[in-house]
A protein has these predicted regions:
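Helix-loop boundary and gating motifs at the non-cytosolic
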Residues: 1-24, 192-245
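MFS-fold secondary transporters
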Residues: 3, 56-61, 78, 150-151, ...
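C-terminal transmembrane bundle of multi-pass solute transporters/carriers
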Residues: 24-29, 36, 40-42, 49, ...
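Hydrophobic alpha-helical transmembrane segments
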Residues: 68-75, 79, 104-162, 243-248, ...
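Small-residue-rich segments within alpha-helical transmembrane domains of MFS-like 12-TM solute carriers
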Residues: 79-87, 215, 300-308
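Conserved extracellular-gate-facing transmembrane-helix segments in secondary transporters
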Residues: 86, 117, 121, 210-219, ...
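Hydrophobic alpha-helical segments of secondary membrane carriers
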Residues: 108-116, 206, 329-334
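Juxtamembrane intracellular "pre-TM" segments in multi-pass secondary transporters
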Residues: 156-205
């Protein structure tokens, strides 16, 4: 809808930058908020921003008053909401499933996100056709309400546990040691805090390298790849190329969960990344549509596997008092560096 109104490639590029830059700059700060305050409330704040953005889009579409600066502001707020949500969400997953089942929890979270990638365009397209862009995006805002309401009293999170302990043992949450939230110096301090932990540093750098040098850049170039493979836009073949990676990731989530495969080990993560690089290279070089489809499917399979593995290894080894900051540092690397994907 935005592209049809403005026909601006620059705005389309800004939408990508506005989505990833907040992860790069503010993930550690978002993690610090999750360390200091209740992660449930931090997630709710992020969802509130998403709801506000969706309602604003709906109003502007309905009133036909959308201007370029409106789009820029809303895209920035949307990116900030995602950066605010991510570290707190991973902290809450850790608290819900515990350390032993953490990889499973992270993997299922990634699988549900992949399912959203597969089904989201279909549902969004259906709403667009059924009720139009304005009411479609307003209905989208309502999707956040059930999770927001559940989080209000959800019996999970450090704040909930410490409240229970305070009731039973005469302690209060305020007595727990927390570090003050600083500016950008927090990023460097967090890096110093974990500098001696080889697993955290290596997994953070590995995830960052994947995002920086490849990331999702090949998705943006898919029209050119598809043209070389004889699959023009708006055809089944083009759609198959776009969704092959997500289908592979969904298969990974299901198969690895059923079989309890791929225990979190740093060496395994490195091997998977190397294999993933080979598959992406094969996709870029092949002239066969069917081989390209196979390469993308298995690349998606491995991507979900090594992403969940690196995330798990970092969370398991993060000190309790700064777990949010460490998760934020990892998120800044793994998601924030996608700003420069394919450099």
């Amino acid at each position: 809808v935005i592209f049809e109104k403005f026909q601006s490639p620059a705005l389309a590029g800004f939408a990508v930058v506005a989505h990833w830059v907040p992860f790069l700059l503010f993930s550690v700060h978002a993690g610090a908020l999750a360390d200091k305050f209740d992660p449930r409330r931090v997630i709710q704040l992020g969802m509130l921003f998403f709801v506000i953005v969706s309602l604003a889009w709906g109003f502007l579409f309905y009133s036909d008053t959308l201007e370029m600066w409106h789009a820029i502001v809303l895209l920035v707020i949307h990116g900030l909401a995602g950066a605010l949500w991510a570290p707190a969400a991973y902290m809450l997953v850790h608290d819900i499933v515990g350390g032993e089942e953490l990889q499973s929890g992270v993997r299922l979270t990634a699988t549900s996100r992949t399912l959203g990638v597969l089904l989201g365009p279909a549902i969004g397209g259906g709403l667009l056709l059924l009720v139009g862009p304005a009411w479609g995006i307003i209905i989208n805002a309502a999707i956040y309400l059930p999770f927001t309401i559940w989080l209000w009293k959800a019996p999970y999170g450090p704040a909930y546990r410490h409240k229970q302990l305070g009731t039973q043992h005469g302690r209060t949450q305020n007595e727990l040691p927390t570090r003050a939230i600083r500016g950008f110096s927090d990023i460097f301090q967090t890096f110093k805090d974990v500098a001696n932990n080889r697993v955290i540093i290596s997994m953070t750098l590995l995830a960052g390298a994947v995002s920086l040098f490849v990331g999702n850049a090949y998705q943006a170039q898919m029209p050119e790849f598809a043209s070389d493979l004889g699959a023009t836009e708006a055809t089944f073949r083009y759609t198959a190329l776009l969704t092959a990676g997500a289908a592979g990731a969904l298969a990974a989530g299901i198969i690895l969960e059923i079989r309890s495969l791929m225990l979190p080990q740093a060496r395994t993560a490195f091997v998977q990344v190397l294999l993933w690089c080979c598959l992406i290279t094969g996709f870029a070089l092949t002239n066969s549509f069917y081989l390209a489809l196979i390469f993308l499917f298995f690349a998606g399979f491995l991507e979900l596997s090594f992403n969940s593995m690196t995330q798990t290894l970092v969370q398991l080894r993060a000190p309790d008092q700064i777990r949010g900051r460490v998760i934020g540092l990892f998120t800044s690397s793994s998601l924030g560096l996608k700003t420069f994907s394919g450099i």
